[in-house]
Structure formats: C-alpha cells, structure tokens
Amino acid sequence: MQMDWLFIAVVSAIGLLSSGVPGTQGAYTTEQCRALNGTCRFYACFPKNVVIGKCDWLGWGCCARTPLERCTAKKGTCTASGCTETDTDHGPCDGGAQCCQRDPVKYCKFHGNVCGRGKCPMDHIPIGEQCMPGYPCCKRDGPAYCKSKGGKCLRRCSQIVPTDIIGVCADGVPCCKSRQSTG
C-alpha cells in the first residue's frame, strides 16, 4: 500500500517537473478538462469513458463519457433526424446525430392539451401521459365541449340512431353525435 502511494507521488512529481507551466504543451489543466465534462485520471479511464486529451500531469489523461453515454445519462436518445419541437436538445451525438429527450410538458401542450395539478380541470380528462409526477396531461372533454362539437350527453347513445361516441361528458356518460345521413 505504501509503495502504491510512493509510486503515485514520484510519477506526479515527475509530471509536475516535466510539464512546466500547467496548460502548456497542448495539455489540459484540471479546470479545462472539467470544462469539457471530463476528469483527469491516472493511466486509464473508467469503462464507457474515452480519453479526450491529456492533462498537464505526466501519464494523466482527460477522460469523459462518450457522446452516447452522456446522452443516455440524460435519459435522451441519439436521433439522426434531429430533435422535434417537443424535444429538449441535449447536444450532439456521434455521426451528426442529436441527443433528444421528449419534454412531457411541451409534448402535452403541443397536442392542444393542458397539464393538471393533481387532477384534470373540469371538462378535461386524463390521457394517460404525465407532464411531471402528480401533473397529468389532460384533454378537453365534458358537456360544454360535447355540445360545441354538435353532440349530446346521453347515458345510452342508442337513443340516437345511428350515432358515434365522440368523447366523454362525465364518468360513464358518453358524448353522442348522430351520423350525417349520406343519401
């Protein structure tokens, strides 16, 4: 154990003497390496990391995650077609692809829906998506919306023949609209 520390101390001292002024000779200072989302490591990088340059200590490399690993850590996906307007762009991946993550709030609102607080507002129903934990994505529905679409709230749509169910007025009460006759 003592020999390991002695070896590291000797190599570090040699690195300090051989590098001269930190940041010279094309090597990164520790701060420059950190600015690139990297870490100065002795000898080898952790698995799933790559050497993106050398640090100003002899034998030390500036290690960082690969673009794919960085993207995966941010819960994104590398997409060759680029991000959509409902995505958050987390920067480049390999081969010109972009790291994109669907933004649940943008996605909900882009489709004309709203984010509820704990539950959906009146005249809205949850669509099964979450804007964030405890905030469901809700689409407009209910009696007022049903009427604005030319429908009626009836317990049984069979009261109007022929009909289509075009929404929900309340729990168990569909919004029914008569089909236009085509003849």
From Swiss-Prot:
Keyword Repeat in record: yes
One Gene Ontology term, aspect cellular component: extracellular region
MF GO annotations: toxin activity
Superkingdom: Eukaryota
Signal sequence residues: 1-26
Any one of the GO BP annotations: defense response
Keywords: Repeat, Secreted, Signal, Toxin
Homology family: Belongs to the beta-defensin family. Helofensin subfamily.
Protein name: Helofensin-1
Lineage, top ranks: Eukaryota, Metazoa, Chordata, Craniata, Vertebrata
